[in-house]
Amino acid sequence: MERKLALLLLLGMITLASSGLREKHVQKLVTLIPNDTLRSIMKTIVHKLAKTQFGCPAYEGYCMNHCQDIERHDGSCHGFKCKCEKS
């Protein structure tokens, strides 16, 4: 039962993370999980998924929107991550 719950939480967090929500929003959900090994594993997974921006190669203009939202700069896709240009 615990394995099924962990898998369900993992899939839910992956869905939320890939839908454009930022890591800070998903980490708020992680705090609802009791303190134990499962919580630390889930926090690590969410952090790693948040660092990889799946929308970068898939959606044209994703990095431009991402960088405008975060840093108010132009952005371009570099591998699987957005690269925000500095002024």
Curated annotation (Swiss-Prot):
It is found in: Secreted. Inhibits voltage-gated potassium channel. Belongs to the long chain scorpion toxin family. Class 1 subfamily. InterPro entries: Long_scorpion_toxin_alpha/beta (IPR029237). Its main location: secreted. The keyword Membrane does not apply. Pfam families: Scorpion_toxin_alpha-beta (PF14866). Residues 53-87 form the BetaSPN-type CS-alpha/beta domain. Residues 20-27 form a propeptide. Expressed by the venom gland. It comes from the Eukaryota. GO terms for molecular function: potassium channel regulator activity; toxin activity. Disulfide bonds join 56-77, 63-82, 67-84. GO terms for cellular component: extracellular region. It comes from Tityus discrepans (Venezuelan scorpion). This is Potassium channel toxin Tdi-beta-KTx. Residues 1-19 form the signal peptide. Keywords: Disulfide bond, Ion channel impairing toxin, Neurotoxin, Potassium channel impairing toxin, Secreted, Signal, Toxin.
